[in-house]
């Protein structure tokens, strides 16, 4: 659906969160264009700044592609001032070729904890926790520190904790 809608746009942009990092490479491949990941600054419509080497250096990336597929680091831009209005909402018709799929629901995880991607403190566990019950130890520590809870991919894959807690790659 997004690839079809992208015909009318020069830039396809997503947050550099788990969803965006999963979706945008597929869109870029379908559009036969490069993806520019994790930008922190827009220099020009075709030029972007992004961190490299774990944030120890920066690369200026210039794209010659007609379509730009870009993910933006969520905390890299200051919030803009609200002008009191809102953008119009346009309904997108995916067309008959997508009629075989049906959106059922989206489940959002509600938590009183800080969001994992922006938390100041994260308490994390891995496969060494050996079970989901042992993650309660991390939960009590995170409560005292007002921290987010993280988990390694191995712990998530083992079913010790849900995948919305996964940190790293």
Segments from the language model and where they lie:
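N-terminal glycine-rich FAD/FM-binding segment characteristic of electron-transfer flavoproteins
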Residues: 1-169
């Amino acid at each position: 659906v997004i690839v079809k809608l992208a015909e009318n746009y020069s830039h396809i942009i997503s947050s550099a969160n788990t969803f965006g990092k999963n979706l945008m490479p597929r869109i870029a491949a379908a559009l036969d264009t490069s993806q520019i990941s994790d930008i922190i600054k827009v220099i020009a419509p075709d030029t972007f700044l992004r961190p490299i080497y774990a944030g120890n250096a920066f690369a200026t990336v210039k794209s010659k592609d007609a379509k730009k597929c870009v993910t933006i680091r969520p905390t890299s831009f200051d919030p803009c001032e609200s002008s009191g209005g809102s953008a119009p909402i346009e309904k997108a018709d995916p067309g008959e070729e997508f009629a075989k799929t049906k959106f059922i629901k989206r489940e959002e995880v509600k938590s009183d904890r800080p969001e994992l991607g922006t938390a100041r403190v994260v308490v994390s566990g891995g496969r060494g926790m050996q079970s989901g019950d042992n993650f309660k130890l991390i939960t009590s520590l995170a409560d005292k520190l007002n921290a987010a809870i993280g988990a390694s991919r191995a712990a998530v894959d083992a079913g010790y904790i849900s995948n919305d807690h996964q940190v790293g790659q």
